Amino acid sequence: MKIVIASRNRKKIEELKRILQGLEITILSVNDFPELEEVKEDGLTFDENALKKARYVCQQTGLPALSDDSGLEVEALGGRPGVRSARYAGDEASDDDNIKKLLEELAGVPSEKRTAQFVCCIALVFPDGKEYIFWGYVRGKISEIPRGTQGFGYDPVFIPEGFKKTFAEMSPHEKDKISHRKEALDKLRDFLIKFAPIYKQNLL
């Protein structure tokens, strides 16, 4: 069985593969299809962006496509960065640029008011037109300085609820147990185990 991940982000692809390991699925990515164009993430919601990417990749490859759109919502900032998380400091911004902007906007905000949540929306689109959405969340707070070298995105400044370490201070295995992406992928995994036989001819 084959599914194409609609992403070129190496670390994200590794995380998705790691969490989905054990299923009888060959996981490809758009890196295996260099002719595919980048999809502009201009949706107003996570599910709009995830579906847009998955639909395009499914249409172009003729294979089921899986797309993840994730972001950080900070309560003190009214839910920002939200769907703009990857481009918070600009369309060409690096992770460090985005973190710098976030911490500048939270300067002076006390620890108890730095609450936030990571959101993950996974879209799975099949060639027969069927579409499915899976959500995952993890609550926590924003640290005052970046800590750790693991992960990507805002991991160095996100401390999940019940922990003292940031995501970036955790091993991949530790993070996988509690992350927003893990929650969404667990729902996807359950779906595939239950319903994949229906789509076997499309997944081969």
Curated annotation (Swiss-Prot):
UniProt catalytic activity: XTP + H2O = XMP + diphosphate + H(+); dITP + H2O = dIMP + diphosphate + H(+); ITP + H2O = IMP + diphosphate + H(+)
NADP listed as a keyword: no
Record Gene3D superfamilies: 3.90.950.10
UniProt-listed GO biological process terms: nucleoside triphosphate catabolic process; nucleotide metabolic process; purine nucleoside triphosphate catabolic process
E.C. code: 3.6.1.66
InterPro entries per UniProt: dITP/XTP_pyrophosphatase (IPR020922), ITPase-like_fam (IPR029001), RdgB/HAM1 (IPR002637)
GO CC annotations, alphabetized: cytoplasm; cytosol
Single GO term (MF): ITP diphosphatase activity
Manner of cofactor binding, per the entry note: Binds 1 Mg(2+) ion per subunit.
Residues noted as binding substrate in the record, renumbered to the chain: S7, R8, N9, R10, K11, K12, S70, F152, G153, Y154, D155, K175, H180, R181
Pfam families, per the entry: Ham1p_like (PF01725)
RNA-binding in keyword set: no
Positions with a binding annotation for Mg(2+): D69
Active site, UniProt feature: D69
Keywords for this protein: Hydrolase, Magnesium, Metal-binding, Nucleotide metabolism, Nucleotide-binding
Family: Belongs to the HAM1 NTPase family.
Cited HAMAP family: Non_canon_purine_NTPase
Role description: Pyrophosphatase that catalyzes the hydrolysis of nucleoside triphosphates to their monophosphate derivatives, with a high preference for the non-canonical purine nucleotides XTP (xanthosine triphosphate), dITP (deoxyinosine triphosphate) and ITP. Seems to function as a house-cleaning enzyme that removes non-canonical purine nucleotides from the nucleotide pool, thus preventing their incorporation into DNA/RNA and avoiding chromosomal lesions.
Subunit structure as annotated in this protein's UniProt entry: Homodimer.
The protein's name: dITP/XTP pyrophosphatase
Species for this entry: Thermodesulfovibrio yellowstonii (strain ATCC 51303 / DSM 11347 / YP87)
